[in-house]
Structure formats: C-alpha cells, structure tokens
A protein has these predicted regions:
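Amphipathic alpha-helical segments used for helix-helix packing
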Residues: 95-119, 166-171
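Amphipathic alpha-helical linker/stalk segments
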Residues: 58-87, 93-95
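Hydrophobic/aromatic residues within well-ordered alpha-helical segments
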Residues: 8, 51, 58, 62-63, ...
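Hydrophobic/aromatic-rich alpha-helical bundle segments in the mid-to-C-terminal region
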Residues: 118, 136, 140-191
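Amphipathic alpha-helical packing segments from all-alpha helical-bundle domains
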Residues: 94, 102, 116-142, 184
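N-terminal intrinsically disordered/low-complexity leader segments
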Residues: 1-7, 200
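Amphipathic alpha-helical segments that line or abut small-molecule/effector binding pockets
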Residues: 14, 81-97, 101, 105, ...
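Helix-turn-helix
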Residues: 11, 15, 19-53, 57-58
Length: 200
C-alpha cells in the first residue's frame, strides 16, 4: 500500500512539474494537475493541501535530489579551499540544470506575491545553508578558518558561487553556463572566500 501511495505521489509531482513549468505558478491550477494525473482534485489535495505546498514539493524533489550530493564534498579532513571548490562545482552543476533554472525563474517572478518564496526558503535553502554553516563551524574549531558568524559566511560563499554567469543566465541575459565556466566560478568563489576567511 505504501509503495502505491509513493508511486501516486511521484506521479503527481511529475505532472505538477510540467504544468508549473508551462504555465507558471499563478496560471497553473490544481484541477489541471489532477486532470493530467488522471485523478480527482480530492485525491490531489489529500497529498498536497495547497498549490503552494505542491509547488514547493516539486522544487524540492527535483532540485534537492540534484543538490544533495554536493554536501558530500564537504569533508572535514580535506583542505578548506579544496573542499569548497569541490562543493561549489557540484552545487553549481546542480542548480544550473534547465529545470532548476526554470523553477528559479518562476520563484523569482511570483515568490513574493504568492507566498511560495518563504515556504521554499524554509524547507530548502535554509536547510542547505545550515548544513554548510555547520561545516564551516567545524573548520573554525579545527583552526582552518577565522572565527566569524558561520551562517553569514555560508550565505556569502553561496552568493560568490552564484554571481556572474549563472546569475546572468537566470536573469535571461545570456545562455546556459558551460562546464568550464562552472569550474572557473567555483574555483574563484573558493579562492576569494578563503583569502578572507581562511587561515594558512
């Protein structure tokens, strides 16, 4: 029974993903998503109580699954700059995929007025930043990083990674970023970050 329930949930997420990407958040309807899945709105609402929660679940399912492996790069026994470079490359590779970029554009355009922005942040980015901050706190304890507010430092590192080509791509100024640009952006972010916060 549980397998069927999870199978249905995944079918809903897959259908919702396509509807949201085609129509955006505001124009998408729970009725249309239910129709695509071949079920009823009642069944849909039994899995996801609101359109906002469904949208966030879709984003977390498809972006979280890609981003999670990046955190495995944060090994305490690695050199700080090497760990951050490895993390940055994996993180940027994940968030530069077409689907993640498309969802971030929807979120940027509709997050404030729909309420999905805070809901997504609390269930996704905030958890990732907290995990990255935990790694940085351990690096401080090991004497490899200056004693600074870890959560703020984590936010700053992510901002460094996302600046430049990726930000311009999300804003529609340029096309997708290349693997070489991902490496360059991650290396530059790690070098800049450790030049200020690292201890040699």
């Amino acid at each position: 029974m549980r397998a069927k329930t999870e199978e249905k949930r995944q079918a809903i997420l897959a259908a919702a993903k396509e509807v949201f990407l085609v129509n955006g958040f505001e124009a998408a309807s729970m009725a249309e998503i239910a129709k695509v899945t071949g079920g009823s709105k009642q069944t849909l609402y039994s899995y996801f109580p609101s359109k906002e929660e469904l949208f966030v679940a879709v984003m977390l399912e498809y972006s979280g699954r890609l981003i999670l492996p990046a955190f495995q790069m944060l090994e305490d026994d690695k050199d700080l700059v090497d760990a951050l470079k490895a993390f940055g490359k994996a993180f940027l590779t994940a968030i530069s995929t077409p689907d993640v970029v498309a969802f971030r554009r929807v979120l940027a355009g509709e997050g404030a007025r729909s309420g999905i922005g805070p809901l997504f942040y609390q269930n996704g980015p905030l958890m990732g930043l907290t995990r990255l901050a935990g790694f940085m706190e351990r690096q401080m304890a090991l004497g490899r990083m200056k004693a600074v507010p870890a959560f703020t430092a984590a936010e700053q590192f992510i901002a460094l990674c996302e600046s430049g080509p990726l930000r311009l791509h999300i804003q529609g100024v340029r096309g997708p970023i290349s693997p070489a640009e991902i490496v360059e952006a991650a290396d530059r972010a790690a070098d800049l970050f450790t030049s200020g916060y690292g201890i040699r």
